[in-house]
Amino acid sequence: MTPVSSRLQPLIIPCVDIQSGRAVRLYEGDPDRETVYFESPLEAARHWAALGAGLVHLVDLDAATGRGENRAVITQITAELGVPVEVGGGIRDRAAAEALLDAGVGRVVIGTAAVKNPALVRELIAAHGPSRVVVSLDARGLDVAIHGWAEGSGVSVAELAPLLAEAGLETLIFTDVTRDGTLRGLDRDLMRQVRQLWSNTLIVGGGVATLDDVRLLAEEGIQGAIVGRAIYEGTLVYPVTGL
């Protein structure tokens, strides 16, 4: 049997979720079920950068849920961290996306706006290139959720994937919201379904708990994962080795 390591080494991207100015993780995306890991999101990002992260994923949870925003904190991290960041949460239109890109963010992560208006993705890619625009589909099963996972969208990953590919999207983030922040591990069958629906770069946005989940990503041909609680609590040691 060919070793997993010779097939694929998934990229593990540390996540810093920001709520009320602090670095937190939520259980299944519920803003009222938070665990605070760092009082300073900048210190959280610096922690992962010091351990070798080449990319840090930032999420403005307050903007995603309409409770406020943490843009000043994100701008500070972008300016001071020294490694690229990608930013998602509450980016509802082209102006918001371009403000972040102009501030030096490596790439923007579009969620609800991409579901409601796939043409926005095409516009941003045409203006800034596919390397600076990512779409995140957050779903229960294959049913996509919007507005900080609080509402169903009425559309599925199967419906959206071809529209996004046609728009020129190269990288898709898929989050199983029923697993995010739970340390329950990945649903292999669901990961396989999504992999079949999206042939370009696929990043899993939640559910990785242990090294076995990273191995699962490699086995299913998934290029990486955004990881939060598992590396904060040590069920997965970062940087990841031992594949």
UniProtKB/Swiss-Prot annotation:
Q: Report any one BP term from Gene Ontology.
A: L-tryptophan biosynthetic process
Per its record, what are the GO molecular function terms? 1-(5-phosphoribosyl)-5-[(5-phosphoribosylamino)methylideneamino]imidazole-4-carboxamide isomerase activity
| Pathway assignment | Amino-acid biosynthesis; L-histidine biosynthesis; L-histidine from 5-phospho-alpha-D-ribose 1-diphosphate: step 4/9
User: What positions belong to coiled-coil segments?
Assistant: none
| Any single Gene Ontology cellular-component annotation | cytoplasm
Q: Which UniProt keywords apply?
A: Amino-acid biosynthesis, Cytoplasm, Histidine biosynthesis, Isomerase
The places in or outside the cell where this protein is found are: Cytoplasm
- Annotated membrane-spanning segments are none
Q: Where is the active site?
A: 17, 138
Q: What is its EC number?
A: 5.3.1.16
Would the keyword Lipoprotein turn up in this protein's UniProt record? no
- Top enzyme class, one word, equals isomerase
* Catalysed conversion reaction: 1-(5-phospho-beta-D-ribosyl)-5-[(5-phospho-beta-D-ribosylamino)methylideneamino]imidazole-4-carboxamide = 5-[(5-phospho-1-deoxy-D-ribulos-1-ylimino)methylamino]-1-(5-phospho-beta-D-ribosyl)imidazole-4-carboxamide
InterPro entries in the record: Aldolase_TIM (IPR013785), His_biosynth (IPR006062), HisA_bact_arch (IPR006063), Isoase_HisA-like (IPR044524), Isoase_HisA-like_bact (IPR023016), RibuloseP-bd_barrel (IPR011060)
CDD domains, per database record: HisA (cd04732)
Annotated family: Belongs to the HisA/HisF family.
What NCBIfam families does the entry give?
Answer: 1-(5-phosphoribosyl)-5-[(5-phosphoribosylamino)methylideneamino]imidazole-4-carboxamide isomerase
Q: What is this protein called?
A: 1-(5-phosphoribosyl)-5-[(5-phosphoribosylamino)methylideneamino] imidazole-4-carboxamide isomerase
- What is the native source organism of this protein? Deinococcus geothermalis (strain DSM 11300 / CIP 105573 / AG-3a)
Q: Name the encoding gene, please.
A: hisA
